[in-house]
Amino acid sequence: KNVRTLADLKKFSVGQGVGWDDVKLYEANGISVVEAKYSNLFRMLHYQRFDLFPRGINEIFTEFEKESAQNPDRVIDENILIHYPWPYYFFVSKNNQALHKRLESGLKKMLKDGSFDAIFWKYNGKAIEAVNFKNRRIIEIQNYLLPKATPLHHSSLWFHPKMK
């Protein structure tokens, strides 16, 4: 409950998987990171090798349920939410321009007709509702890993908890 800002968050260490891109992101924001194999992170949290194990909205509830028998003392914090832009990209061979154009055209049509959002909410809505954003303090972290061409200004491409 005492974590209100990024400066407050920097007083804690986070656990992350070896080689995860999030490691660089947290370190670039001045947050101490302990890396380990994913399968060891829950046990390491139990033994206080680090303070926090940030998980994505699409991961936290499933993992919590799966790991709760082995880690009964673990809780999901209900006060804060760490947020940073994290895109998912489609990569295609530069030799397949037809596929590139077809994917881009299809995604643009989906954004325009609302089917992109419908699919997003179909697969993520339950977890997003369970997070209960209105009762959480959102701590924004910069994602310095993003290419300069990342369309951060195109709000229809991003989910942001403040817009929820």
Predicted regions and their residues:
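A ligand-binding cleft/hinge motif common to bilobed small-molecule-binding domains
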Residues: 53-73
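Short helix-loop capping/hinge motifs at secondary-structure junctions, enriched
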Residues: 1-4, 34, 95-101
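Periplasmic-binding protein-like
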Residues: 68-104, 109-123, 126-150, 157-162
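Secondary-structure junction motif
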Residues: 14-27, 57
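Short beta-strand-to-loop elements that line the ligand-binding cleft
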Residues: 15-16, 31-41
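Short helices/loops that flank or line small-molecule/ion binding pockets
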Residues: 28-29, 39-59
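A conserved helix-loop-strand patch within extracytoplasmic ligand-binding domains
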Residues: 1-19
